[in-house]
A protein has these predicted regions:
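Conserved HGGG/HGGXW glycine-rich cap/lid loop of the alpha/beta-hydrolase fold
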Residues: 2-43
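Active-site loop/oxyanion-hole signature of alpha/beta-hydrolase fold enzymes
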Residues: 30, 36-72, 88-89, 112-116
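Short beta-strand immediately N-terminal to the catalytic nucleophile in serine-hydrolase-like folds
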Residues: 73-75, 100
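Gly/Ala-rich beta-loop-alpha elbow adjacent to hydrolase catalytic centers
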Residues: 75-79, 83
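Flexible "cap/lid" loop of the alpha/beta hydrolase fold
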Residues: 93-94, 98-135, 139, 172-173, ...
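Active-site nucleophile elbow and catalytic-triad environment of alpha/beta-hydrolase enzymes
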Residues: 163-182, 198
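Short beta-strand/loop motif that positions the catalytic acidic residue
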Residues: 192-194
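Conserved loop-alpha-helix segment in the C-terminal half of the alpha/beta-hydrolase fold
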Residues: 196-229, 242
Length: 242
């Protein structure tokens, strides 16, 4: 049985892993689903001052408090930025890194910077305009959630996702990732899981980049961006087998 830490994406919270975590626990795995500062049940802590570093520390703190090691660490979407930083800070404790339809950053990358790399210029401009535009319009420094329909989330789940998602600090997308701990060298396996049922997706870029790369394995699930919501049993089976 494995120690599995599931890290959500932007504007979501630990709530989004509900069904996936339930299936994994039923199979005997230890599962943690930390929520980032400022979203989910921690939305009352929301602030434009929250950064990527804040969220990295959130997850590091969870792992240290739960005294977990030999971890399968899975990050969804923006969570790919977070788990990369977490693995860097915890040398020897993360066994497998899973990028679930997620960004795969290198040192110095920001999420918004990666959009320019992963998407056609006009599509990247639309995403960036939405993120920066809503933060500016609200005079709060907070981005509004993208509607679930844009990610092709199953109609039965869209209202639940839209109801639960909240605004998130733009700074989390603008701050570059700073790697300093050397922990990534100790990760034994990296898995990329592409959600192959929606577009325009920046994540096809990463799946193509790492398919066949040494130390990587690429899987595809035919569904929306929110795999953990729409295909929890399939995702749990994949994670539980790692």
């Amino acid at each position: 049985m494995a120690n599995i830490v599931l890290v959500h994406g932007a504007c979501h919270g630990g709530w989004c892993w509900r069904d996936t975590a339930r299936a994994l626990r039923a199979a005997g795995h230890v599962v943690a689903t930390p929520t980032h500062t400022g979203v989910g049940e921690r939305a009352h802590q929301s602030s434009e001052a929250i950064t990527l570093e804040t969220h990295i520390r959130d997850v590091v703190g969870c792992i240290e408090a739960e005294e977990l090691d030999e971890i399968v660490l899975c990050g969804h979407s923006y969570g790919g930025m977070v788990v990369t930083g977490v693995a860097d800070r915890l040398p020897g404790r993360v066994r497998t890194l899973v990028y679930l339809d997620a960004f795969v950053p290198k040192d110095g990358d920001s999420l918004n910077g990666l959009l320019d790399v992963a998407l056609a210029p006009e599509v990247a401009a639309q995403f960036l305009g939405a993120f920066r535009g809503t933060a500016a319009a609200s005079h709060s420094g907070l981005m509004q959630p993208i509607p679930a329909a844009m990610f092709n989330i199953d109609e039965a789940n869209r209202a639940w996702v839209d109801r639960r998602c909240v605004a998130q600090a733009l700074a989390t997308f603008e701050m570059p990732l700073l790697l300093s701990g050397g922990g990534l060298e100790h990760v034994k396996e990296r898995v990329y899981v592409l959600a192959d049922g929606w577009d325009p997706s920046p994540f096809r870029h990463f799946a193509k980049l790492y398919e066949g790369a040494e130390g990587w394995r690429v899987e595809k699930i035919a569904c929306s961006h929110d795999v953990m919501v729409d295909r929890p049993a399939e995702l749990a089976a994949l994670l539980g087998a790692l």
